[in-house]
Amino acid sequence: MSTKRQKRERKQAALAKENERSTLISFISFFIIAFLFFLWGSWLLPITDPVESNYALTAREMVESGDWMSPQIYGVYWYDKPIMVYWFLSLAYSALGFTDLASRLPSALAGALSVALLIWYLRRILKDNVVSIWAGVMLATSLECWVISHAIITDSLLLLFTIPTMLSAYIGITENSKKHLVIAYAGAGLACLTKGPVGLVLPGLLLVLWCLSMKSPKTILRLFPWQGLLAFFVIVLPWYGGMYAIHGSDFINEFLGLHNVLRATSSEHPEDNHWYYYLILLPASLLPWAFVSFYEMKMRWKEKGAFYLFLMVWCWGTILFYTLMATKYVTYSYIAVVPAITFAAFGALRIRMGEKLPSILGGLGLLLLMAALFAGTFRLKEGNWLVFYAVLAYGLFAYLIRWKANQYKRLTIISAVTASAFLCCISEGLPHFMICLLYTSPSPRD
């Protein structure tokens, strides 16, 4: 009996080891594919004013001055954002020089890592390869993820650190795993070094709301392990404490007061201050997967399991949080894309099984995205759009005309056509569009 048990245990250990190896290979493979996808054409995109140039110029001065602690622009200390994005940009500049490619490398890297991490976490939580892989594919081909993974802003890095913050917290709470809760707090610490206090405050609020929705007191108690709090402070205190020691109240007043509290209480862009702002933005951000995502949210409403509630609180709690903030900005709700895309990945199972309505909704999302890009080609006449038109024609033919024949290829068609269209845009129209922005936007000095 003992011998049989030992054989069974050895077999289970071998299977577990093989599964870990397979997971690692998948992680690396999807990271490389996503990284090349996001990196393609980045060298064609000039740095635009004023937002991108502020980050790029600050990082350049960091390299040239040798002061990697205090961000500054034109010799003036700059407290707009924490240090993380400047460190990544400075490392890229140190390795590749002050080029457009180096400027966009950190966002491409963060976007690819986000895709790979989402696949890893969903495989870990759901034990479902199909859902996890399609979640990664859908995230990479969603409109906002593709755009932000090419932009010189903080949001790509914020998403990268928010994924382990939220998903490790879910694992830590549901499985009572101290290790994953420490990872979650470490992710929150890195997010605070990227975007500021919101990197901890928003995930914390979302997790507390989710724990309350579970109606289980022990989940709340598990949320605050001392080891996690220690990990958080070990990560954030060196820079925040160092900045206060060097700059004193100027840092506190400008960083926390002007760039955090004031933006939350006083609108920086009054023309965008509408309650429905993010309700319009989220579906557009998710294209071509928006309708599949919302359909799956509705279909799973009656289940209301732990992971469903977690994703709903994450998605709509983020939208509510930023709706209540005075300043509205197109990238603020970016982290809501991850739970919404996860719902779309659940919907992928229905499309793969040939269900009619999810397949129609997937095609509708593709049609809207292609229509928007098609309209853009008439505004940007400098590019050669023949390849894009061929991609569009193939998409219409494969998805609509050969509807029944391609029943089990619909997901592949949507993702392939979307990815191809994005690559056409970055090779032809987007560089011309950004050059126009460069000459019509105000200088960061203004």
Model region roles, listed by residue range:
Residues 3-7, 15-357:
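Membrane-integral, polyisoprenol-dependent glycosyltransferases
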Residues 182, 299-441, 445:
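Membrane-embedded architecture of ER/inner-membrane glycosylation machinery
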Residues 104, 445-446:
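Short, cationic motifs built from Arg/Lys/His that form the positively charged side of catalytic pockets
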